[in-house]
Regions:
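Assembly-associated, polar helix/coil segments characteristic of icosahedral protein shells
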Residues: 1-109
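Extended oligomerization regions of viral-like shell subunits
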Residues: 53, 72-73, 159-295, 300-311
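Hydrophobic alpha-helical segments involved in membrane association or supramolecular assembly
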Residues: 80-81, 141, 201
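Bulky hydrophobic/aromatic "packing anchor" residues in well-ordered structure
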Residues: 80-81, 121, 239, 288
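Short helix/loop capping segments that flank catalytic or ligand/cofactor-binding pockets
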Residues: 82, 88-93, 130-132, 214-217, ...
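Residues immediately flanking
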Residues: 83-84, 123-125, 209, 290
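Short loop/turn segments at secondary-structure transitions that flank enzyme active sites
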Residues: 85-89, 118, 127, 149, ...
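Alpha-helical scaffold segments that mediate packing/assembly in large oligomeric complexes
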Residues: 99-194, 305-311
Length: 311
């Protein structure tokens, strides 16, 4: 009598979890039980519980995943519709004519691309042997660091070519609210009021530590500081620090203010991982290729305004 082993184990099953992490530790044969998590290039989706841990840690580490709007669309359309804010309501006299309004004009179409963010890392075989019980948490934490830093750089400075379109992109990025030759009290105020009230309502500031240090010393004519040191706000709006924002140099855009929820991150594929045993065999290491597919765009450029430095 032959025994048939079912290799089609769902990613949310405990068996898949065990086989997946044994596979990553370099043990032979376990990939045969991961068929339902395998993609077209031979990488495997992490178990459901591990994916949840990764996503939660990535959100906690990633500034933009906290401020932006994130969608997961692995098999979705190649474009998204974004609503344009149009005031269409009007007062009508009793018995008066109500003007028809074509709501299709409310939407703009943005094409999505599958930009690949990838990392290759390697671990000594001795590390795998001696640290079996912390292996999952170590790999998860390291991937979170790698991906969160690369994502933030792309979400700020991405050009849209082989990477997302960042908020500072020349095409598709935030609108310029103020041009200035220096960061002054008045110029920061001008940037704030260059945004429409609807975007100021939930607006936040984003800048580097260097720029924040310069602003912390700004005061008005009466000596009142612009920066509220008690809660790290400017004009009542929270300040977020990103070291991927540029410094105060000619041509740079060191300060952004607005509603970052209009920056959309669309995940086309979650993180998948495959081992690279042969590549690092001679050094007694196991290599890993991990990657994700995503795109991101500022669907309403006027929602975020930036200060651009001039000579």
């Amino acid at each position: 009598m032959s025994i048939v082993t079912d290799t089609f184990i769902s990613t949310n099953q405990p068996e898949y979890h065990s086989h997946f992490w044994d596979y990553l530790m370099g043990k032979e044969g376990h990939e045969n039980f991961l068929d339902l998590g395998r993609n077209a290039v031979g990488a495997y989706a992490p178990p459901t519980t591990s994916s949840k841990k990764f996503e939660d840690k990535l959100k906690a580490e990633s500034l933009f995943r906290q401020l932006a709007t994130v969608h997961y669309a692995p098999n979705g359309p190649s474009s998204i519709l974004a609503k344009v804010n149009t005031d269409s309501a009007e007062w009508v006299a009793p018995g008066g004519t109500i003007n028809a309004y074509d709501a299709i004009n409310d939407f703009s179409t943005y094409r999505l691309n599958d930009h690949k963010l990838a990392v290759v890392m390697q671990l000594d075989a001795s590390f795998l042997h001696d640290n079996r019980y912390i292996f999952e948490s170590y790999v998860t934490g390291r991937l979170v660091k790698d991906f969160s830093h690369a994502e933030e750089c792309g979400f700020v400075n991405g050009t849209g070519k082989n990477m997302p379109t960042g908020i500072l992109a020349e095409n598709g990025g935030a609108e310029i609210g103020v041009t200035a030759d220096a960061i002054t009290y008045d110029n920061v105020i001008k940037l704030f009021f260059s945004t429409k009230p609807e975007y100021r309502k939930d607006g936040v500031w984003m800048m580097s530590s260097e720029t924040a240090l310069a602003i912390r010393s700004l005061t008005d004519a009466a000596g009142q500081p612009l920066w509220n040191h008690a809660n790290d706000t400017i004009l009542g709006k929270k300040v977020y620090i990103s070291e991927y924002m540029p410094g105060v140099k000619v041509g740079n855009k060191p300060i952004a203010f607005g509603d970052f929820s209009f920056y959309r991150i669309v995940e086309r594929s979650g993180v998948t991982i495959r081992t690279l045993r042969e590549r690092f065999f001679e050094t007694d290491q196991v290599g890993y290729l991990a990657f994700e597919l995503l795109d991101s765009k500022l669907i309403r450029p006027e929602a975020i305004k930036v200060m651009q430095m001039t000579a």
